[in-house]
Curated annotation (Swiss-Prot):
Belongs to the mitochondrion-specific ribosomal protein mL53 family. This is Large ribosomal subunit protein mL53. Keywords: Mitochondrion, Ribonucleoprotein, Ribosomal protein, Transit peptide. One of its GO terms (cellular component) is mitochondrial inner membrane. It is found in: Mitochondrion. GO terms for biological process: mitochondrial translation. Component of the mitochondrial large ribosomal subunit (mt-LSU). Mature mammalian 55S mitochondrial ribosomes consist of a small (28S) and a large (39S) subunit. The 28S small subunit contains a 12S ribosomal RNA (12S mt-rRNA) and 30 different proteins. The 39S large subunit contains a 16S rRNA (16S mt-rRNA), a copy of mitochondrial valine transfer RNA (mt-tRNA(Val)), which plays an integral structural role, and 52 different proteins. mL53 is located at the L7/L12 stalk. It comes from Homo sapiens (Human).
Length: 112
């Protein structure tokens, strides 16, 4: 998990919304994900990214909704995912968005 955290950054992310009911039994991984993304080190990678914790008392399924700056959306249902799986998926989407964004910029290195 430490390796996934070392490279985690929010540069292409516009908003992260984490929704869960704290009284359900399957929210630990979602809460761990929220704690990781809310850390000062990760938040400092993009000060314009808003991290929203939506805590409800309605028995709803834990959910993470990530909105990227290019309009791409990642929705993870946290009931049956571990924190590591959520962080790994999040990091891979961030790398994909970074690669897509850098390819659109003029003068970007094409590797030729």
């Amino acid at each position: 998990m430490a390796a996934a955290l070392a490279r985690l950054g929010l540069r292409p992310v516009k908003q992260v919304r984490v929704q869960f009911c704290p009284f359900e039994k399957n929210v630990e991984s979602t809460r761990t994900f929220l704690q990781t993304v809310s850390s000062e080190k990760v938040r400092s990678t993009n000060l314009n990214c808003s991290v929203i914790a939506d805590v409800r008392h309605d028995g709803s399924e834990p959910c993470v909704d990530v909105l990227f700056g290019d309009g791409h959306r990642l929705i993870m249902r946290g009931a049956h995912l571990t924190a590591l799986e959520m962080l790994t998926a999040f990091a891979s989407h961030i790398r994909a968005r970074d690669a897509a964004g850098s390819g659109d910029k003029p003068g970007a290195d094409t590797g030729r």
